[in-house]
Amino acid sequence: MKTFVAKPETVKRDWYVVDATGKTLGRLATELARRLRGKHKAEYTPHVDTGDYIIVINAEKVAVTGNKESDKLYHWHTGYVGGIKQATFKEMIARRPEAVIEIAVKGMLPKGPLGRAMYRKLKVYAGSEHNHAAQQPQVLDI
């Protein structure tokens, strides 16, 4: 019996919507990354993007444990001299709540073209509204 290898043109991708209200950031991000890679499917193949599309709503209501709300720092650089910036988790939630989940999930995906293709299937929204109703996403309870 030969080993099954998925082909990009035969992969069936579903759309799922996940509510992040009250979910722990890391535990949510690991499950999202797993589903974006397609590791939950029997036909998973490491070098083929077999993952599903994931819509995350209520990103502003994601939770962290302990003192991470004030202690967890996000760093970035503006590209200008002396342009290193940082913000706490609380500041990031106030400024751009989608980025918190996006950064967490992106770090858990493979680096390179395949990982970027997987990351593009993640859609994160701060509130409870999203504009993907035409795709008829199924509710995914994580």
Swiss-Prot record:
Entry keyword annotation includes Mitochondrion: no
Family to which the UniProt record says this protein belongs: Belongs to the universal ribosomal protein uL13 family.
A Pfam family reported for this protein in Swiss-Prot or TrEMBL: Ribosomal_L13
HAMAP family: Ribosomal_uL13
A Gene Ontology molecular function term of the record: mRNA binding
Name listed for the protein in its UniProt record: Large ribosomal subunit protein uL13
Description of how the protein assembles with itself and partners: Part of the 50S ribosomal subunit.
Signal peptide extent: none
Known function: This protein is one of the early assembly proteins of the 50S ribosomal subunit, although it is not seen to bind rRNA by itself. It is important during the early stages of 50S assembly.
Keywords: Ribonucleoprotein, Ribosomal protein
GO CC annotations, alphabetized: cytosolic large ribosomal subunit
